[in-house]
Amino acid sequence: MMEQCLDQNQEFVDLITSERLCGESSNRSSPSYDASGSFLEKTKNLFCSGVFLKGVAHAVGFWNPRKGLRALMAIIVLFLDVYYLFEAVYYAFLCGHFETPLDQWMCPNASQNSSSTHNIPVLAFLHGVELVNILSLVAYLAVLMSNTAFFWCMWNMKCHTSNCMTLEKAYSSAGRSLWVRLNCTLLLFGFSLVIMIVWFNLTFKGLFINNLSISLGIIPRLATLTSCFLFSLITNAMKDCVTSCQAEIRNSINSSLDDIIRIHKHLCEQIFCTSDSLKPWFAIHWFLLAVTAVIYVADMVEFFHKNATGWYDFYQVTLISAIYLYAFVYPSYCAASVTSRCNKMLKELNLTSNDEWDTGHPFHSRTQLALFIQYAQYTDCGFRAGEVTFGSNFAWFSTLIAMCGVGVKVL
């Protein structure tokens, strides 16, 4: 009897469960549920992929399999860079001092006083140039040189595909967490720049050509940010190579010390080849953005007090300063993280005791491990800028340089 009751209860439970499952399946099969679930899933997958960064990189000419389109977009971006540098030079040294046919486009707000400036001494003329105009000139020069150097490095990296970490390899090895972080930063700066342009066009009514010129100014800055994101993508792939090297070393059973050294040597060749290919951009970008970041931070408060007329000026100066600070500091930390990961691998190998290695592994003998650690330390494997390995000390030094602007202003 008890068994019959249990069987009946089990049938009743199975019936209820089947009805619930049918109800849930009917709800899930409804068009509204499928549409919302599919949309959320596609949005999640899109946000965890490199579609945004790859699209922006194609748009600014940094990354495109078709060389013709890549060269065309690069020419457009570099033309804008040169134009804004010329505009900054013109506004700083000619507007209000000399009268030319370009004044109506280049000098919308400058007062013309050309008659009194033809015979003044050069030092007096330079003394009359405002600091904010020099600041703009230095910033556009840094953007032009940085973008040009990155174009050059990406174009020439194809010649070293055997050992170098190219964008294609880095793109295929990137994980979801990296894409989420890069997409968040990219969308944050992108939307902030778009808000700045929309705000400007709604607030200030001027000539169409002037508004268009200011609106297109976000493209060079976006290209500079994109180069930093692509550099982060490459350095992340370099760190993955270190992880793979460490795993290969640990699994090298029944091998000799020379075999382990060859594995590590191949890793160093990959890192050195990639860092040498990016060396022109990294050196130019680091130096010029350091100068720009220090000047912007040092002059930001004073510029706001003297020139700001509302919330737009505060938003613009703060956003541009944040962009230059990020573009200067972030690549330094990316480069230092590669060297730090190499040192961490050696530290973890050194902390492994003899009994943790397999019997056939050469590092089962502590003497062999000590010889390898000594060899690896002399190789100084890590991200190199010239003959200098860029480690964590340089990253902190970059942060100190960025903070020097605040110190200069306080003093």
Language-model region placement:
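Short intrinsically disordered, low-complexity coil segments enriched in acidic
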Residues: M1-M2, A174
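Short, isolated positions within intrinsically disordered regulatory regions of eukaryotic proteins
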Residues: K67, N109, N156-C159, N183, ...
